[in-house]
Amino acid sequence: MVHNFIEFETERLKLRRFKDEDLEYFYQYRANPKVAKYQGWQDYSYEQAISFIEKQKIAIANIPDTWVQVAIELKDHGRLIGDFGIHTLELPLNSIEIGFTLDPQFQKQGYATEALNGLVNHAFNVLYKEKIQAIAVEQNDSSIKLLKRIGFRQVKKIENSPFKGQIVNEFVFELTKVDWVG
């Protein structure tokens, strides 16, 4: 079965396609310098947020070498609290790379762990992926701890990588379906 988008629910969260109502919350956390610190953007504009949401409302998942973003909604309030980036890799086959962003006011409440567990389960058991990868800047302790808590293993260190005008080290993490189901 081909899945053209990634939608599922966890106990407290709904992961779904972006919609117009997400714009204000999305812009609010994306424009926050604390959020952007370890992300690929900085000085995020309102116009960028509008364009991004318009593109993501019609994005199609599972196309090799493309990224889609999945909105993370708090079910009780219908409010956007973050998003996942999901990159369908060309090689290795049946693999994805992920990235994640969570609004700071919803951090340290278990939402990132719940959302990532849900995404991993969905990727392996619904989308039939075999491997999930993530890359984190060495200083991004929160993301590294989250990945390890879920079961990701560090498989590589990329030294002297350019990032936002600096030279940093990055860690590549992987989780395979075999390791996930144990």
Language-model features: where?
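Secondary-structure boundary/capping residues
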Residues: 44, 62-65, 132
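Hydrophobic residues in alpha-helical segments
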Residues: 30, 39, 60-62
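A short helix-loop-beta-strand connector motif used in the catalytic cores of GNAT acetyltransferases and
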Residues: 57-71
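Acyl-donor (CoA/ACP) binding surface of acyl/acetyltransferases
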Residues: 1-36, 72-182
